[in-house]
Amino acid sequence: DVEVSRALAKELGVKVKFVEVKWDSLIAGLDSDKYDLVTNQVAITAERKKKYDFSIPHTYSYPAIITKKDNTEITKMSDIKGHKFSQTGSSNFSKIVEKYKGEIVATNDWNENVSLVEQGRVDGTVNDTLAYYDLVNKKPDTDLKIAAQGKEVSEQALIFNKGQDDLKKNVDKALKSLKKSGKLAEISNKYFKTDVSHK
């Protein structure tokens, strides 16, 4: 996200100022005008679209159950039922665990989710394939795997407060240019070892 933001800023001819916050506070920062937009793999949802505007999607992913490699009990999404999952409170992935009647162990972030799975304190965590690809890129010897993957594609985009039409229009134009030039694919391959900038 940082590299995509820098590429966008360069394309737009502006300087970017990063504000690092916890996931659960990201969107709240938009509400309080702490920053102009959020670029942190925010999934486009009907609920969020009621209150916010989104750029065109810049990454695509799928929900995935991430477990230890030796876990043989969880092989499909419905296997969530009756198992413990580490999840951040406001993520879309917590809703998946609730839907399949799994038990949620609340955490603050992805790193904590992974840590609890690695320690065997939970059976797994549900997140997107992007998070797992990034984990493997940073930690190739990880003891975790994708045990099951959902079929619903998730589109991630930059998120803005409604009414920032000029900013949205310019960001969309810049994203299209970065896609066309191959820059988004290049960044994607660098961090995920696969191109997630297209469906």
Predicted regions and their residues:
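Short helix-initiation/N-cap motifs at beta->coil->alpha
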Residues: K17-A28, T72, S90, V105-Q119, ...
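Ligand-binding clefts/hinges and TM-proximal coupling segments of bilobed small-molecule sensing domains
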Residues: N92-T107, D143-A148, K173-K199
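Extended ligand-binding regions for polar small-molecule ligands
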Residues: V2-E11, N71, G89-S91, E155-T194
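Periplasmic-binding protein-like
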Residues: Y60-T67, Y133-K176, T194-K199
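Alpha-to-beta junction loops
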Residues: G13-K15, D31-N40, K84, E118-A131, ...
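A ligand-binding cleft/hinge motif common to bilobed small-molecule-binding domains
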Residues: S25, V42-K50, I96-K99, D123-V153
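Bilobed "Venus flytrap"/periplasmic-binding protein-like clamshell domains
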Residues: D1-K10, Y62-W110, V114, T129-Y133
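Acidic, polar ligand-binding/catalytic clefts
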Residues: V2, R6, K10, K15-D79
